[in-house]
Amino acid sequence: MTSRNYLLLTPGPLTTSRTVKEAMLFDSCTWDDDYNIGVVEQIRQQLTEMATASEGYTSVLLQGSGSYAVEAVLGSALGPQDKVLIVSNGAYGARMVEMAGLMGIAHHAYDCGEVARPDVQAIDAILNADPTISHIAMVHSETTTGMLNPIDEVGTLAHRYGKTYIVDAMSSFGGIPMDIAALHIDYLISSANKCIQGVPGFAFVIAREQKLAACKGRSRSLSLDLYAQWRCMEDNHGKWRFTSPTHTVLAFAQALKELAKEGGVAARHQRYQQNQRSLVAGMRALGFNTLLDDELHSPIITAFYSPEDPQYRFSEFYRRLKEQGFVIYPGKVSQSDCFRIGNIGEVYAADITALLTAIRTAMYWTK
């Protein structure tokens, strides 16, 4: 265990503010109205309002990581006669395919490759050829590569074909402006420890109430029953079915205040975008190349090719950066040797400048 605090250049968990951390110093009783009505219900309302101004949506909080909520949605939203088209171009789309397989959910996996943008015409053709498909699921910000996927165009298709639309917006919600009603999204999934800049411990689903109501009795899991979790919160003023991660929830409530103070999602998006552009420009000046073309990048995380120098080892590069107080991500692309640097969380222009200086110092293979 180290007492040193690092700047996390990762897509979550990420570097949080001191005040978000301090919010966890308070102990809450999960039965108290002060907590359930005063904190949980306020969070649910704020999340829904952040997602859309349209009526008919609600928020459900669920213990666990983002993947728990993805599995809860897939396992609750699809009935035994339903079939989901899963658009996959990275590890997190592939994880949805794996979940569907394990739960015995009928699915069509459209895998367009890790460095390719999903082809909307191909998706159109799949939907046209297979009328048994009832749902579409895809990742918005695919952090495997840093790709930002076309949820708007796919949402238009979902609406035209009358399909239920599920979007994993784990690493984009709160950091990229969106109106989920305008995007025809029925279920949006995200997590406390991403763009809203809270800490790990729970995920959340923002969904059409009409769609949620139809999930009754469908869940393939007791703990991950999205309908039951929603009804418990609705009927008991924010109470969770099972033990609430109280400290994480308090941290998240503080993080929401800080998001508003920053100027909301639009202002945070601008900061993330500037961070990412400065990072890419600086890395290219140091001789690194990006995995994706610029027009495909999200403002969340960027994948860089590893240097071709035979002396280069990611583990040594990582160690030298960590010694200087910076933590980056290893690559997750199966076909390319790369590493990833995130720029969300409490990360500002001065931090990117300091990181680039540290990277220059850590480039031992150029000495």
Swiss-Prot record:
Q: Which Gene3D superfamilies match?
A: Aspartate Aminotransferase, domain 1, Type I PLP-dependent aspartate aminotransferase-like (Major domain)
Q: Which cofactor does it need?
A: pyridoxal 5'-phosphate
**Presence of the UniProt keyword Transferase in the record:** yes
Q: Which residues carry this modification: N6-(pyridoxal phosphate)lysine?
A: 194
Q: Please name the Pfam families in this protein's record.
A: Aminotran_5
InterPro entries, per the entry? Aminotrans_V_dom, NH2EtPonate_pyrv_transaminase, PyrdxlP-dep_Trfase, PyrdxlP-dep_Trfase_major, PyrdxlP-dep_Trfase_small, SP_NH2Trfase/AEP_transaminase
Q: What is its EC number?
A: 2.6.1.37
Origin: domain of life: Bacteria
- The EC class name is transferase
* UniProt key word Transferase: yes
Q: Which Gene Ontology BP terms does the record give? A: organic phosphonate catabolic process
Catalytic activity from the UniProt record: (2-aminoethyl)phosphonate + pyruvate = phosphonoacetaldehyde + L-alanine
Report a single Gene Ontology molecular function. 2-aminoethylphosphonate-pyruvate transaminase activity
Q: How does it assemble?
A: Homodimer.
PANTHER family xrefs: 2-AMINOETHYLPHOSPHONATE--PYRUVATE TRANSAMINASE (PTHR42778:SF1)
**Family as reported in the entry's similarity comment:** Belongs to the class-V pyridoxal-phosphate-dependent aminotransferase family. PhnW subfamily.
Question: What protein is this chain from?
Answer: 2-aminoethylphosphonate--pyruvate transaminase
Source organism? Salmonella gallinarum (strain 287/91 / NCTC 13346)
Print the organism lineage.
Bacteria, Pseudomonadati, Pseudomonadota, Gammaproteobacteria, Enterobacterales
